[in-house]
Amino acid sequence: MSRAAVFSRQCFWRPIFIALLCLFAAACQTTRPVTSADAERVDLRLQLATAYLERGQPNVALTEAKRALEVDPSSARAFNIKALALMALQRVDAAKQAMQAAVALAPTDLSYQHNVAWLQCMSGDVEQALQAFDAVILRAVNDFNPAQTHLSLGVCAIQAKRFELAERALRQAVVDARYANAANFGLATLMVQSENWPAAVRYLASMSPAYRVSPEVLNLQMHIDAQYDRMQQAPADGMNPSAFN
């Protein structure tokens, strides 16, 4: 398996890595008056959309977000969820349009700025995304936790092969329990990139048992195990199998 295959751009779209995305904003912004009943309908639709997105069902999430927008066409949160669903479906242009709508409706909400940066990263504008993540971290205030942005910055930096930046960012994210599993996976991936197999094993072992059985983690573990096997078979090449123990 090639190193590029170890860390694909889509791997974090799986439900266990939804931590990379800001699903909820600090508030539910809207620019037009809505009745209490309508607000409840929108909230219910978006709760459903979020749940479907977390379960890896972006098509259904997109439908629910669209239904929310039928009730309130100026809901920034609905445009945000719509954009994330479109991102998961790899409909990049449509996702950008929806995210731009969310930002236009709530320009001061750092959650949406975070997601704009992630969309840039996933669509190939990696350097621009890194700058955008930095801007979000610099602007972080009391109601916005920068640990999530450090996590996404680290993942994006891996895409740019900015490994030192990636490691610094992921180490800042790993201290937050909510993002520790995804950050440890990112750090393990970094260690595989640098062929530091013992460290990669340690980071994978730091993940919770439920996360360690995900397809992405098992795939990375298999890659590491293959290195164990090669070292056992060819110690004369300078490899030391005991380094993994």
Predicted regions and their residues:
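Bacterial Sec signal peptide processing site at the extreme N-terminus
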Residues: 22-44
